[in-house]
A protein has these predicted regions:
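Ribokinase/PfkB-type carbohydrate-kinase core domain
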Residues: 1-13, 72-90, 102-159
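Glycine-rich phosphate/adenosyl-contacting loop at the front of the ribokinase-like
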Residues: 1-64, 69-79, 144
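Generic hydrophobic-segment detector
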Residues: 30-31, 61, 97, 106, ...
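Beta-strand->loop->alpha-helix junctions that form or flank phosphate-binding loops
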Residues: 62-67, 84-95
């Protein structure tokens, strides 16, 4: 019997804005047609891919989704997969989001990130007694500042 995988950490909404060109400081550029909204971050990206690869694989999501429309969107998207357990997702504060500027000419992207609840996610937010999985995956460390704090024994809390 499969025990499954827990995907923990960032739950992010990515809003992608196609732009004509990257402007210099104090200059203007136009946002063109094709603005998109999608889920992102380690939890959403990893768990949805795993759910599609094996619909029978038990999966557990752990992280923060805000008490806002973006948090509702994150839960709705992950909720499309019957094998994703959302019981360890906490609703708190604002949902993390990234405004992605996608240059139509060069295809390069620039990311503006708002941490939201992800800034406070830490080991105390994981119900270790309830969690019964074979694999625990967590990320993205640089977007989880509470877990990136120094630790005398291991270097950082996440280590």
């Amino acid at each position: 019997m499969k025990k499954g995988i827990c995907c923990a950490g960032n739950m992010i909404v990515d809003i992608t804005y196609p732009i004509e060109t990257w402007p210099k400081q104090n200059e203007l550029t136009h946002i063109t047609e094709g603005i998109t909204r999608s889920t992102g971050g380690s939890v959403c990206n990893t768990i949805s891919d795993l759910a599609r690869l094996d619909p029978q694989l038990p999966l557990v999501a752990s992280g923060f989704a805000g008490h806002d429309a973006e948090g509702d969107f994150v839960l709705q998207e992950m909720g499309k997969y019957k094998n994703i357990d959302l019981s360890m997702v906490r609703r708190s504060g604002d949902t993390s989001f990234t405004a992605v500027m996608s240059n139509n000419q060069t295809k390069e992207r620039t990311f503006f990130q708002y941490a939201g609840g992800n800034a406070y996610y830490g080991e105390d937010d994981i119900d270790w007694d309830k969690l019964d999985v074979d694999i625990f995956h967590i990320g993205y460390i640089l977007l989880l500042p509470h877990l990136d704090e120094p630790d005398a024994e291991y270097g950082t809390k996440m280590a």
